[in-house]
Amino acid sequence: MPSHASQPATSRPITNVLTNPPQLPLIAPSILAADYTKLGEECRSAIEAGGDLLHFDVMDGHLVPNLALGVDMLASLKAAMPDAFFDAHLMIERPDVFAEPFAQAGAEHLTFHIEAMNGEMAGDRGRALIDTIRGLGMSAGIAIDGPTAIEKADALLEHADLVLIMAIRAGFSGQAFAPAALDKIRYVRERVSETTRIEVDGGVGPANAADLLQAGADVLAAASAVFRVSPPERVSVITQMRGSASGS
């Protein structure tokens, strides 16, 4: 079997909030759980409460059993909030087709699922997509769904700027956190550099933030924990999650 390490992604890493963070951990409010009737207001509230970036879930109804958000939605939010950092998480079968549209819409980071990279050439296709994403001016991440064995990501771990570990089965917000994600975080942290971000998505909140950070995560994508409380309470939620890094 040929070595994946002999065929690295050739593009230069992008410098942004994720790859060169002003602080760790980073808190990424996930707008999937926001009130869509006032989405702009919700996003501003999350940033004003201390969120570092906005996690933007995209679903096509094929890779995952739900539909959510899209290019035009991100473009509208970016136009209204030009200083906000958008972390686009593409839970779709053809991330290669949508990399450029999301870059043009204003995404600063794009994560695609390894489950979308099928076949014998999955590693090569994944590395090529990482190059494409960086060539468009975005940092590049890979995501692993909850039921997927973490070893399936081995061919791409060393090439991505970020590894996103789903602590649920991708598709719906509000699911319970699966503790097996902690072992996946440890597995990845042992195999990537200190500058590679590890993001966790699904059931994330103050109750498990300390465990996630201790395992090696440094980006927490929180949906219901942030958006299912009132705006004044969001400051406390984000502060608690960030404070978990020091045990406070």
Region roles according to the model:
Residues 2-33, 40-41:
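N-terminal amphipathic alpha-helix/helix-capping segment at the start of soluble metabolic enzymes
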Residues 26-30, 54-56, 77, 86-90, ...:
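Hydrophobic faces of well-ordered beta-strands that scaffold small-molecule active sites
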Residues 30-34, 59-61, 91-93, 115-117, ...:
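Active-site beta-loop-alpha junctions enriched in small/polar residues
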Residues 38, 83, 97-101, 107-197:
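Conserved anion-binding
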Residues 39, 46, 57, 102, ...:
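Conserved, mostly hydrophobic/aromatic
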Residues 48-51, 107, 160, 217:
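A structural motif
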Residues 54-71, 114-121, 168-176, 230:
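Glycine-rich, proline-tolerant flexible connector loops at the mouths of alpha/beta enzymes
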Residues 213, 227-248:
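C-terminal helical cap(s) of enzyme catalytic domains, especially alpha/beta-barrels
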